[in-house]
Design a protein with these regions (language model features):
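Conserved active-site alpha-helix within GNAT-family acetyltransferase domains
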Residues: 92-93, 116-135
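Conserved GNAT acetyl-CoA-binding A-motif
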Residues: 103-114
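A short, internal acetyl-CoA/4′-phosphopantetheine-binding micro-motif in the GNAT/acyltransferase core
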Residues: 79-86, 114-115
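Conserved N-terminal entry element of GNAT/NAT acetyltransferase domains
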Residues: 1-14, 146-154
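Acetyl-CoA-dependent GNAT
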Residues: 10-78, 101, 133-134
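Single conserved hydrophobic/aromatic residue that forms the stacking wall/gate
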Residues: 152-163
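Conserved acetyl-CoA-binding loop-helix of GNAT-fold acetyltransferases
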Residues: 87-100
Length: 163
């Protein structure tokens, strides 16, 4: 830790341009045009108005976490700290602020996804006491008309067992 001064506060839509610029500076960051657009983040923040956080130092945003929940489980997205501001406790402080906000909303379990290639991030979460789950497979499904039609027309497991 150092004597770097920073403040953790809830993210607002007014922070979007600065947060997006920060995301663009992070090597290997996965950004999606729809979900991470200003409109996508606005939807997310409206649904989760108190749980996402930014870190501000010297008048600029140097860290951010999108954090939300579905009423049952919380999830962290796009956890990042500007490269020049790492190793000052900013990531931990933002994560703790998110966890406290989730607790206020009666959420008691949180998940996150980290790219396997994100060695620094994976080390951070392991050191912070998060459990790596080897018993799960993670699946993604993009909601677009072609995929939904494919799902609808693909055989169900019951159909496959009778052939």
């Amino acid at each position: 830790m150092s004597d770097l001064e920073y403040k953790i506060r809830p993210m607002t839509l007014d922070d979007y341009d600065e947060v997006y610029a920060l995301w663009m500076q992070i090597h290997g960051f996965g950004i999606r045009s729809i979900d991470d657009s200003k409109e996508g983040v606005e939807r997310f923040l409206k649904r989760n108005p108190t749980t996402s956080m930014v870190a501000v130092s010297e008048g600029k945003i140097v860290g951010a976490i999108l954090c939300g929940h579905d009423g049952r489980r919380g999830c962290l997205y796009h956890v990042c700290v500007h490269e020049n501001y790492r190793k000052h406790g900013i990531g931990k402080s933002m994560a703790v602020a998110c966890m406290r906000a989730l607790q206020e909303e009666k959420i008691n379990k949180v998940c996150l996804i980290a790219f396997k290639s994100n060695e620094l991030g994976n080390h951070f979460w392991k050191e912070a006491g998060w459990d790596f789950r080897e018993d799960l497979n993670y699946y993604d499904f993009t909601l677009n008309e072609a995929n939904i039609c494919l799902l609808y027309t693909s055989p169900s497991p019951r159909d496959l067992s009778t052939s």
